[in-house]
Amino acid sequence: MPWISSHMNSSSVLDFFPHKTMAVDIAMKFYLRSPPLRRDRVECRIARKSNEPLRPCIQTTNKTLLSELSNQENKVKKRVSFADSRGLALTMVKVYSDFDDELEIPFNISELIDNIVNLTTVEKERFFLDFVQPSADYLDFRNRLQAESVCLENCMLKDKALVGTVKVKNLAFQKSVKIRMTCDSWQTYKDYDCLYVKDTYAGSDKDTFSFDVSLPEGIQSSASIEFAVCFECEGRIFWDSNKGLNYRIVRQDHRIPSDFESRHYDPVCLSVDQYGSPRCSYGIFPELQTYSGFDKLGPYY
């Protein structure tokens, strides 16, 4: 092989070949003539990679999730059954024996029980008016006042007290009106003074007096309260005793039935005064005699 100088350039190398040669052809020849050790190492690396298993592109489900699904499938489903279907009783009875020691009831519960008992007692001790309101029959009320010079106008029970008004004729300036009350059929009695009520219209020939009398305490269950109105003027005494029957206050259990009014006033026989107005309104509104909604009592004229 001829000797080649070390000072050769690329053009001189290409001129060395007998036929026309490109530089890329020379590079390929040098690459193909690489040392055998390097070529074997590259082939070994390629062979090792070809033996590894291929990984799938789709990932499988998580193992923990698969185990949970399998456990749920293995669980037994719950079922409901009734006692009678198994021959058992549908009800259960428990018997409790009395305690040897007395139970200690809290104070607030004891107080509540006492209040309930007291309310029941108060309900039994309620009183009612056992007479018709005098002013319910206005014509009769006016005639009685003209004839007897005194007449109970109206009254009602309020908080264990009897309150009302009395109408009297203005016979003189000095006059006194009182309520005489008893709870033992007049074996004993007590007088309660009435107070003068100033008339709205001056120059009237009639005066009005009011009273507020507390009912006696400790009245026997079989006893009733009776009262009458006394009017004193210029040494003369006038009485309104409900036409001799007295005004009575009775307990709830001794109250006369509601047909009491029908025996005293017949709705068919209602009288009419000279002005054409009905003389009796009690047959239309009988509940007014015990109505406790009137806070202000006053005269009708």
From Swiss-Prot:
- Residue interval(s) of motif PP1-binding motif: 79-82
**Pfam families from the UniProt entry:** CBM_21
Q: Which UniProt keywords apply?
A: Carbohydrate metabolism, Glycogen metabolism
Enumerate the spans annotated as CBM21 domain. Answer: 142-250
Instruction: Name the GO terms of the biological process aspect.
Output: glycogen metabolic process; regulation of glycogen catabolic process
- A single Gene Ontology molecular function, please? protein phosphatase regulator activity
Against Gene3D superfamilies, the record matches this protein to: Carbohydrate binding type-21 domain (2.60.40.2440)
- Say yes or no: keyword Transcription present: no
- GO cellular component annotations, sorted alphabetically? protein phosphatase type 1 complex
In terms of CDD domains, this protein maps to: PBD_PPP1R3B
Taxonomically, the superkingdom here is Eukaryota
As for what it does, the entry says: Acts as a glycogen-targeting subunit for phosphatase PP1. Facilitates interaction of the PP1 with enzymes of the glycogen metabolism and regulates its activity. Suppresses the rate at which PP1 dephosphorylates (inactivates) glycogen phosphorylase and enhances the rate at which it activates glycogen synthase and therefore limits glycogen breakdown.
**Domains as described in the record:** The N-terminal region is required for binding to PP1, the central region is required for binding to glycogen and the C-terminal region is required for binding to glycogen phosphorylase, glycogen synthase and phosphorylase kinase.
Assembly description: Interacts with glycogen, PPP1CC catalytic subunit of PP1 and PYGL. Associates with glycogen particles. Forms complexes with debranching enzyme, glycogen phosphorylase, glycogen synthase and phosphorylase kinase which is necessary for its regulation of PP1 activity.
The protein in question is named: Protein phosphatase 1 regulatory subunit 3B
Source organism per UniProt: Xenopus tropicalis (Western clawed frog)
